[in-house]
Amino acid sequence: MDRHSSYIFIWLQLELCAMAVLLTKGEIRCYCDAAHCVATGYMCKSELSACFSRLLDPQNTNSPLTHGCLDSLASTADICRAKQAQNHSGPTMPTLECCHEDMCNYRGLHDVLSPPKSEASGQGNRYQHDSSRNLITKVQELTSSKELWFRAAVIAVPIAGGLILVLLIMLALRMLRSENKRLQDQRQQMLSRLHYSFHGHHSKKGQVAKLDLECMVPVSGQENCCLTCDKMRQADLSNEKILSLVHWGMYSGHGKLEFV
């Protein structure tokens, strides 16, 4: 029992160490609009803890944006630095934007990366940017709450499984002990019955022999003096199925007995 307890304690320690390593490993969720992210709800996990947003065509200011995790970038030259591309009209604009928070690259508007063209457009962009920030905040709160529940489940499920395993082992040991005790009691009862039947059989045989000796020597000269002995002996013989060598006959008055 002590050995099983030490093994279970070591296994629980290893499980807790593995969970601590997984939880301390930095991973964030990013908004992803690639084809392989459709099945995961337009989200991906970044082990580099970095999300990106970039223009598909750096030379075109009206080019659509693409979003995703920095791990999925094929080229290592775009790793989290804002590249500057010179357009034909002269203004500079970033082709890659990186961030390091959950769903921080969620952008619903193209002009997030584009510079303002006029004062009016800049004012409208500010309002749109504020609404986009509010949406991002809501998404981040929802994601953080889901992440919190997920981490709690990751911690609680192995601990609950370990406790259930310990309870099952203790229950199995208790059942084995009770079964062993029951078998020992049955064995003791069987031995007691055999001992009692053996000694009871020998005592009955002694009583039958004593009865034979008493009936062989009659007290008076009357006939059928052993009638009572015959009845008692026949009852014992019918119960125990013991055959006697003496055949009881009628007393002739001369003390003569007939034997088979």
Curated annotation (Swiss-Prot):
GO terms for cellular component: cytoplasm; plasma membrane. Glycans are attached at N87. Residues 1-26 form the signal peptide. One of its GO terms (biological process) is cell migration. It comes from the Eukaryota. Keywords: Glycoprotein, Membrane, Signal, Transmembrane, Transmembrane helix. The keyword Cell membrane does not apply. InterPro entries: BAMBI (IPR009345), BAMBI_C (IPR045806), BAMBI_N (IPR045807), Snake_toxin-like_sf (IPR045860). Gene3D superfamilies: CD59. The chain crosses the membrane at residues 153-173. Residues 27-152 are extracellular. Residues 174-260 are cytoplasmic. Detected in granulosa and thecal cells of adult ovaries and in spermatogonia, spermatocytes, round spermatids, and Sertoli cells of adult testes. Belongs to the BAMBI family. Negatively regulates TGF-beta signaling. This is BMP and activin membrane-bound inhibitor homolog. The gene is Bambi.
